[in-house]
């Protein structure tokens, strides 16, 4: 299984038979290395409805006939746009042909903002996502604050790779993310959601170096690791 980082919170997972993408914010993402028209994906996983996470979901889903898996209200909203969706909710899990998906808590917001019409559409609760494929588990925390039940997530799951936001301001910052990494007990921790905008500028290397046992890893944009 190949896992690639594409800037901000965009992650792709490639298996023998499937191409999966998390939170495909590409248009307007100054850090990304890919364009929406070039994305090959049969599954799109969304943590919440903010524009910098839903991103190019509609275009990618339609050009690939991809399945979009998202928290319930967000899935319903995207279904109304003609996308093939599967709604889930916090604590729920489901086995799909590509692997198992489970949604966890995330402490954040979730809404789609239309700047032109000055409207905000509520899209339910935000989530983290546990993806288990080929006996490996990836945890994408989405946008979140630190919360104590991360200990429980770590106790109940053997996490091989965790993606944690460190940007601060809108999510937890490096200090809280360090504690999250400890509680989650992941074998490897990669920082995300930083340096896309001035307000979330951080030093990812300093964060990775602060984690004990060499579990911290900074993935450069376009870098791939194998699990």
From Swiss-Prot:
Q: Which GO terms describe its molecular function?
A: hydrolase activity
Cite the SUPFAM superfamilies for this sequence: Metallo-hydrolase/oxidoreductase
Keyword match Hydrolase: yes
> What are the entry keywords?
Hydrolase
Per its UniProt record, what Pfam families does this chain match? Answer: Lactamase_B_2
In the record, the note on similarity to other proteins reads: Belongs to the UPF0173 family.
Q: What protein does this entry describe?
A: UPF0173 metal-dependent hydrolase YtkL
Gene name, per UniProt, is ytkL
């Amino acid at each position: 299984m190949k896992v690639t980082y594409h800037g901000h919170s965009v992650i792709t997972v490639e298996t023998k038979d499937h191409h999966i993408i998390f939170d495909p914010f590409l248009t307007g993402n100054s850090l990304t290395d890919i364009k929406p028209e070039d994305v090959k994906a049969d599954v799109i996983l969304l943590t919440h409805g903010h524009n910098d996470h839903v991103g190019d979901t509609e275009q990618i889903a339609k050009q690939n006939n991809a399945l979009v898996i998202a928290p319930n209200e967000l899935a319903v909203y995207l279904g109304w746009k003609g996308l093939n969706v599967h709604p889930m909710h916090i604590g729920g899990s489901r086995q799909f042909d590509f692997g198992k998906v489970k949604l966890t808590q995330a402490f954040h917001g979730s809404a789609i903002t239309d700047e032109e019409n000055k409207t905000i559409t509520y899209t339910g609760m935000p989530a983290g996502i546990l993806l288990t494929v080929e006996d490996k588990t990836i945890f994408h925390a989405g946008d979140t604050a630190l919360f104590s039940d991360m200990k429980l997530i770590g106790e109940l799951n053997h996490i091989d790779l965790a993606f944690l936001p460190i940007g601060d301001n809108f999510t937890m910052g490096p200090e809280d993310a360090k504690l999250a990494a400890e509680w989650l007990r992941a074998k490897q921790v990669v920082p995300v959601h930083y340096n896309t905008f001035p307000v979330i500028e951080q030093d990812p290397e300093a964060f990775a170096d602060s984690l004990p046992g060499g579990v911290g890893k900074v993935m450069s944009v376009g870098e791939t690791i194998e699990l």
